[in-house]
Amino acid sequence: HWMVRRQRQMCIRDSDSTPFYGESGGQVGDKGKLSAKGLEIEVLDTQKIGNFHLHISKIKKGSINLNDRVKAEINTERRRAIVSNHSATHLMHSALRNILGEHVQQKGSLVNEEKLRFDFSHKQKLSESEIARIEQEVNQAITSAEDTQIIETSIEESQKLGAIAFFGEKYGDQVRVLKIAGDYSTELCGGTHVKNSSEIKSFKIISETSISSGVRRIEAISGDLAIKDKADNKTDLLN
């Protein structure tokens, strides 16, 4: 269904069947375009409300009516960067638990095309050595080049698989288990992810701070941005 607000400026599309990912689970919504003969619509954001997706859009050319058919195209380059950062978040979560201890629990996250942000329970500042070990573990998992496995199962079966569930999250009878880099990371997640861990390419932590008592925040980058950052820093060290 289409709802049009301020003709040629804004339209919102409700749909439970769309290639656009609606913002949820810390992952930002997709951008892209919708088109038809004589019609161009820029999708500025996608939000998820219940089973519906709201496509917040700007009509650039033409007009749209109820039941018009359109071609939907997401911004694939942007999605690719988001997917890389989301999968890297899962790998980093596993590395944090392996290196710092199982007391580490996710307290919040944000995944967009530029970086990942992950808040977690831990009482003290991470040392340079711990940060280096986390980066090393994540990059080793990336180079394992394992295919991502998606398992639709019951919450009980997911627990038997060792999947990490998040306190306070509401789960239905059926859940989606994501296994990234083999058995290295197993979590419940409804987001979009790489098909193979090698697609992440590289991982680099760019900051680690305290945001409240007992909660730390890591910001990191992956993919080509991480490769460029490492190359730039290597050049700096040589000069």
PLM regions and their residue ranges:
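Short helix/loop capping segments that flank catalytic or ligand/cofactor-binding pockets
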Residues: 21-24, 31, 82, 128-129, ...
